[in-house]
Swiss-Prot record:
Subcellular location(s) per record: Cytoplasm
Protein name per Swiss-Prot or TrEMBL: Ribosomal protein L11 methyltransferase
Binding site for S-adenosyl-L-methionine: T141, G164, D186, N233
Gene3D superfamilies on file: Vaccinia Virus protein VP39
Record carries keyword Transferase: yes
Signal peptide residue numbers: none
Family, as annotated: Belongs to the methyltransferase superfamily. PrmA family.
Species annotation: Synechocystis sp. (strain ATCC 27184 / PCC 6803 / Kazusa)
Main EC class the enzyme belongs to: transferase
């Protein structure tokens, strides 16, 4: 019989191109905490879920979805494994794989359970991701933070939007760089809680980083006027669907940072941007992922 505080540890050994999809699957499955570890030519993605939240049949269905994702991406099927561990083992297993991570020229990301130094030549971004995607270790998150280093100009008092804010890491990063205000939305209420916790962890006032549950309609209600820039680090097909909706929320000549995009999906994103009145300024690539920086053309 499992202990009262048992957790499922779910392990997915997969092709690197499946990393973000695997994270997304685990998040939607309800995992509280995820991590990734490089293994030769593969990646080991872990997720943790209270035992009472899933039965064996649920886990088998999750494994099948991951296999279908691999077929879609035309890569080898992942190796899927699950086991029950106690609560203390879960906490240790997840956290031991995550250490302070320098990102770009300006940031260093510190897990909440590691005390940061009193003095640093980098901006210290503290994070406890909980259920949310965005620990700073994924290529797409790093590309977005590095893009923000180029786009955020403190003397311009920029107001930004973060669509699908996850752990809040990108909105927090923007405020640390000098953005006057960031509006973040995510359609997962647990993720919103995580982002608000991280906002507090970084001592950012709620007026400077507004975090609400929702998507584009809620973002439209939050902002008083079009924003200077928008950040969107989610799946490519979702970006294509949402582009017509969020384009009017950005000022003419405003910018967008878009990631969560596989390299082979970049043409579809470029086409969607052009169709919605955007010009691609730069495409940065890392591993199998890319990040678009785009500028909105003058409105009608």
């Amino acid at each position: 019989m499992a202990a009262a505080n048992s957790w499922w540890e779910i392990r997915i050994l997969c092709h690197p191109s499946l990393e973000e999809t695997a994270f997304w699957r685990l998040e939607k499955f309800g995992c509280l905490g995820t991590s990734t570890e490089k293994k030769a030519h593969s990646l080991l993605v872990r997720g943790y879920l209270p035992q009472e939240k899933a039965e064996i049949l649920d886990l088998a269905a999750l494994a099948l979805w991951c296999e279908q994702d691999a077929l879609l991406f035309q890569v080898p099927k992942p190796r899927f494994h699950w086991q029950l561990i106690d609560e203390e083992d879960w906490s240790i297993s997840w956290k031991e794989h995550w250490q302070p991570t320098p990102v770009g020229d300006r940031f260093i990301i510190y897990p909440a359970w590691i005390d940061p130094p009193e003095n640093s030549d980098r901006l210290i971004l503290r994070l406890d991701p909980g259920v949310a995607f965005g620990t700073g270790t994924h290529a797409t998150t790093q590309l977005c933070l590095e893009s923000l280093e180029m786009r955020v100009e403190p003397d311009k008092h920029q107001v930004l939007a973060d669509l699908g804010c996850g752990s809040g890491i990108l909105g927090i990063g923007a405020v640390l760089l000098g953005a006057a205000k960031v509006y973040g939305v995510d359609n997962d209420p647990l993720t919103v809680e995580s982002a608000r916790h991280n906002r507090h962890l970084n001592q950012i006032h709620p007026d400077n980083l507004v975090i609400n549950e929702g998507s584009v309609p809620e973002l439209e209600q939050l902002i008083a006027e079009p924003v200077d820039g928008i950040i969107c680090n989610i799946l490519a097909e979702v970006i294509v669907d949402l582009l017509p909706q969020f384009t009017p929320l950005v000022k003419p000549h405003g910018w967008a940072i878009l990631s969560g995009i596989m390299v082979e999906q970049s043409q579809a994103i470029a086409d969607a941007l052009e169709q919605n009145g955007w010009t691609v300024v730069a495409i940065w690539k890392r591993q199998e992922w890319c990040c678009f920086q785009a500028r909105r053309e003058e409105g009608d």
